[in-house]
């Protein structure tokens, strides 16, 4: 019996996506990553069909005994590698994690201070996103243009004058750490809470190449589980025993999630174990690669942001491409060559230019997980030059990209031997391992 045409189309699209993005492109989106085959093997399980409202061992459904076990184990593992006391894995994204925290800390009309948009504040921190939807007034802290960061002295003065309910640090264009330990005492002095959005840098924190916000004075930390932490898409909230965490945890259900996508839990646990054993080497290679790529692009004539600061301390590189037509044009041109990046506002762009900003945001974390190192960053920079500066034939560059990827198809920083997994596979589900 042949498949209906509609079904064939679904299968064709899915296969095309897998072939294209898994084997033929340089994936340089800073907010993406790839799970290991090991994590993927437990992602598809019976958990994907089940519900478990509430917290482990305090559910509103029956049939959750293994859900309770895996969720508790995953939280314990995440606390271990994060060096934290509290973890909640129920947020289904970093933005949902932010929403839960913001809603508990303030009422409509209250004020919150955020890192300036020029320093990379995420849209959920602004009036255009979650804060605005909750009716919380956001005020941007002053920007230090030279250091591409929060202006510490001016921010302290603003905190003392405004007396906000909370202050948010962290961002989405995030080259350098925000001044957590410098601001924390002043935030607490006015009775406010310090929230750190570590969505982009969570894997770097675990890998000990980025300082821990909780150890520097943050009251609560929100994360994504699919950026520099290479797990399934989702969110999480951490604290070091703060009362705020308890309040937030009580409201995640039923305010922000009902069921929390249980199939994420085994894959998150596996990724946490991988990060426990391989996270430091992975994070160190990420930061070496980002710096190598930034330097290689600068050497080839690109205007890379942050030259006076060493370009970057994270997984990201930011490039001003105004002279070549702007971020929108260049991101599309690179995609034609199978190089996947995103257009991005740069510190001197106005928010209304979001559709055609000055820059590109590049992330090296996924290609690092496929085994690329500094020498490959040189090659990638040369490919950028061929497309953007030299204006080489796009199809020829595309062939070079595909040839390059042939040597980088296997996920690294994981456990190699998959044979032992067969005894855990459900024959009825036919898990792919």
Curated annotation (Swiss-Prot):
UniProt protein name: Serine hydroxymethyltransferase
Site label Plays an important role in substrate specificity, positions: 226
InterPro entries for the chain: PyrdxlP-dep_Trfase, PyrdxlP-dep_Trfase_major, PyrdxlP-dep_Trfase_small, Ser_HO-MeTrfase, Ser_HO-MeTrfase-like, Ser_HO-MeTrfase_PLP_BS, SHMT-like_dom
Pathway, per Swiss-Prot/TrEMBL? Answer: Amino-acid biosynthesis; glycine biosynthesis; glycine from L-serine: step 1/1
**Which cofactor(s) are needed, names only?**
pyridoxal 5'-phosphate
Q: Which UniProt keywords apply?
A: Amino-acid biosynthesis, Cytoplasm, One-carbon metabolism, Pyridoxal phosphate, Transferase
Q: Name one Pfam family in it.
A: SHMT
The similarity comment for this entry is: Belongs to the SHMT family.
An example of a Gene Ontology cellular component annotation for this protein is: cytoplasm
Where in the cell? Cytoplasm
- Entry EC number(s): 2.1.2.-
Record flagged with keyword Cytoplasm: yes
Top-level taxon of origin: Archaea
Xref: PANTHER family:
SERINE HYDROXYMETHYLTRANSFERASE, SERINE HYDROXYMETHYLTRANSFERASE 1
Its EC top class is transferase
Q: Which species does this protein come from?
A: Saccharolobus islandicus (strain Y.G.57.14 / Yellowstone #1)
Query: Which portions of this protein are annotated as coiled-coil regions?
Result: none
Quaternary state and interactors? Homodimer.
What job does this protein perform? Catalyzes the reversible interconversion of serine and glycine with a modified folate serving as the one-carbon carrier. Also exhibits a pteridine-independent aldolase activity toward beta-hydroxyamino acids, producing glycine and aldehydes, via a retro-aldol mechanism.
Q: For (6S)-5,6,7,8-tetrahydrofolate, which residues are the binding ones?
A: 121-123, 243
Gene Ontology annotations of biological process type: glycine biosynthetic process from serine; tetrahydrofolate interconversion
* In-chain residues carrying the UniProt-annotated modification N6-(pyridoxal phosphate)lysine: 227
Entry keyword annotation includes Amino-acid biosynthesis: yes
């Amino acid at each position: 019996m042949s498949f209906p045409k509609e079904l064939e189309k679904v299968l064709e699209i899915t296969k095309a996506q897998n072939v294209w993005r898994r084997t033929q492109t340089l994936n340089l989106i800073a907010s993406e990553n790839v799970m290991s085959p090991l994590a993927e093997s437990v992602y598809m399980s019976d958990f994907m069909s089940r519900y478990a409202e509430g917290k482990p061992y305090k559910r509103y459904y029956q049939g959750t005994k293994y859900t309770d076990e895996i969720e508790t184990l995953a939280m314990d593992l995440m606390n271990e590698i994060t060096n934290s006391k509290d973890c909640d894995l129920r947020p289904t994204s970093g933005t949902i994690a932010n929403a839960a925290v913001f809603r508990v800390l303030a009422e409509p009309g209250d004020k919150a201070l955020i890192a300036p948009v020029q320093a990379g504040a995420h849209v959920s921190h602004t009036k255009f996103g979650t804060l605005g939807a909750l009716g919380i007034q956001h005020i941007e802290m002053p920007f230090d243009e030279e250091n591409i960061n929060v202006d510490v002295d001016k921010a302290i003065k603003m905190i003392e004058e405004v007396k906000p309910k909370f202050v948010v640090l962290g961002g989405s264009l995030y080259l350098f750490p925000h001044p957590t330990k410098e601001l924390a005492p002043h935030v607490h002095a006015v009775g406010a809470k310090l929230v750190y959005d570590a969505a982009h840098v969570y894997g770097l924190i675990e890998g000990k190449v980025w300082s821990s916000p909780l150890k520097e004075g943050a009251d609560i930390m929100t994360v994504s589980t699919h950026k520099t932490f290479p797990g399934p898409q989702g969110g999480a909230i951490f604290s070091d025993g703060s009362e705020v965490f308890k309040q937030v945890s009580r409201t995640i259900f039923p305010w922000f999630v009902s069921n929390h996508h249980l199939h994420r839990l085994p894959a998150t646990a596996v990724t946490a174990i991988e990060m426990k054993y391989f996270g430091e080497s992975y994070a160190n290679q990420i930061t070496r690669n980002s710096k190598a790529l930034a330097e290689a692009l600068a050497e080839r004539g690109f205007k890379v942001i942050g030259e006076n600061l060493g370009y970057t301390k994270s997984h990201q590189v930011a490039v001003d491409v105004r002279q070549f037509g702007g971020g929108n044009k260049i991101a599309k041109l690179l995609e034609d060559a199978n190089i996947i990046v995103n257009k991005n506002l740069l510190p001197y762009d106005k928010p209304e230019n979001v559709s055609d900003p000055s820059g590109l945001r590049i992330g090296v974390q996924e290609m690092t997980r496929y085994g690329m190192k500094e020498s490959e960053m040189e090659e990638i920079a040369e490919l950028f030059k061929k497309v953007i500066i030299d204006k080489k034939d796009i199809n020829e560059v595309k062939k070079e990209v595909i040839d390059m990827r042939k040597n980088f198809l296997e996920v690294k920083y994981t456990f190699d031997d998959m044979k032992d997994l067969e005894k855990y596979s459900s024959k009825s589900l036919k898990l792919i391992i």
